[in-house]
Amino acid sequence: MPEPRAVASLLVAFVDLTRFAAQSQRVDDVELADTIDAYYEHVGAAVQAAGGRIVKFIGDGVLIVFEADQVDRGVEALLGLKESIDRLMTQRGWECRLVAKAHFGTAIAGLFGVVGDKHHDVIGKAVNTTVALDGSGVTLSVAAFRKLGPVLRRRFKKHTPPVSYIRIEDPRRFR
């Protein structure tokens, strides 16, 4: 039976790797495929362990969602991924680092695609807002930050303009 589309309140996250395109040019396709597969496996395991869902892989980008009652677990997973993926890439000799962005909002969740080949996806402004967040480490929108519990909030600081929250360890980016 087809999965119905529904409005869902979600923590929407997008992760990708800095310098991935440049690094992929210096290796052969076999190493590239092995590296991206190891990255996918690592991200997938961490997201599933935290109760989240991989919506899709897009090259080195990954669209991830967590249900509204899993915001802290989702953000903790992103923080853990930042450290573990950076370590994985360093061990492989790749000069890539993980960037993670998260926003809390509503999106339409359900099956999308061509007839006979529909896949679960999330569509809406919350997804666009997530991807548009500016940051170099782990960045949260105000809406995502406000959903965090008090202990996890202490791991972030305000970064303006526009207002977003970044890990204490991440440098500020000035334009």
Q: Language-model features: where?
A:
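Catalytic/regulatory signature loops of cyclic-dinucleotide turnover enzymes
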Residues: M89, K125-R146
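A general secondary-structure junction signal
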Residues: I58, A100-T106, V142-R146
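A short glycine-enriched loop-to-beta-strand structural element that forms part of the catalytic core
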Residues: L11, W94-L111
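Catalytic-core segments of nucleotide cyclases and related cyclic-nucleotide turnover enzymes
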Residues: A109-D134
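Alpha-helix/helix-capping structural signal
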Residues: T18, T106-A107, N128, A143
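Short helix/loop segment flanking the catalytic signature motif in cyclic-nucleotide metabolism enzymes
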Residues: D28-E31, K56-R97, A102, V122
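Intrinsically disordered, glycine/charged-rich C-terminal tails and inter-domain linkers
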Residues: M1, S9, S136-R175
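Catalytic NTP-binding/metal-coordinating core of nucleotidyl cyclase/transferase enzymes
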Residues: P2-R73
